[in-house]
């Protein structure tokens, strides 16, 4: 039923003039050329005899004091097309004293049923629209995946030479400071020696040997480095441990120390 108008009432009779008055109230004068379907005693029907989503406008003209039942409003939502309009108004023969007393209840019923944009009319009526979405419908939210910003590398750009940051002072080879115990070409212990050189020199002096004899020991007979068992009585290395010729004689820390 394309471009159809459905008029319902809870009374036994519904004058067609009231239907057209309601159509004009909707601001659709062209609807007068249509043949509205009129249903009486609609409050007694469990289901409206109309296909789903087949009606553009539903006009409900009410006589009784009670508001339209929830089941009837749900049926009107079913038969209306998307963006279809429902108009509920008081009948001219209605026993309702003041429509304002039930208008708030009607508005709540329409919203709870799923209608949108309820609007109270001056002529003791209220209208609303069927939404374009289905009640209880759902859809998946698309998660926006944000990629990390890409770094643009310009291979044509000039590379910086790190050596250009070096000064002439940086390029000079560092010179190590002389040790505390080094004076000229010959190393001697300083006055306040803390490196152990003074103790070594003291041991050499007690033995009566020169520094050259300790650092580079030599032997005319070839037995000086073998130990006291092979040394002669006049050997300058008598009392020292065995050593290799040409290598510095290593003196132990307790050398020349008293046994008791």
Swiss-Prot record:
It holds the Pfam family CIAPIN1. A motif (Cx2C motif 2) lies at residues 232-235. [2Fe-2S] cluster binds at residues 181, 190, 193, 195. A motif (Cx2C motif 1) lies at residues 221-224. GO terms for cellular component: cytoplasm; mitochondrial intermembrane space. It is found in: Cytoplasm; Mitochondrion intermembrane space. One of its GO terms (molecular function) is metal ion binding. [4Fe-4S] cluster binds at residues 221, 224, 232, 235. It comes from the Eukaryota. Residues 221-235 are annotated as: Fe-S binding site B. Its cofactor is [2Fe-2S] cluster; [4Fe-4S] cluster. GO terms for biological process: iron-sulfur cluster assembly. Component of the cytosolic iron-sulfur (Fe-S) protein assembly (CIA) machinery. Required for the maturation of extramitochondrial Fe-S proteins. Part of an electron transfer chain functioning in an early step of cytosolic Fe-S biogenesis, facilitating the de novo assembly of a [4Fe-4S] cluster on the cytosolic Fe-S scaffold complex. Electrons are transferred from NADPH via a FAD- and FMN-containing diflavin oxidoreductase. Monomer. Belongs to the anamorsin family. This is Anamorsin homolog. It comes from Glycine max (Soybean).
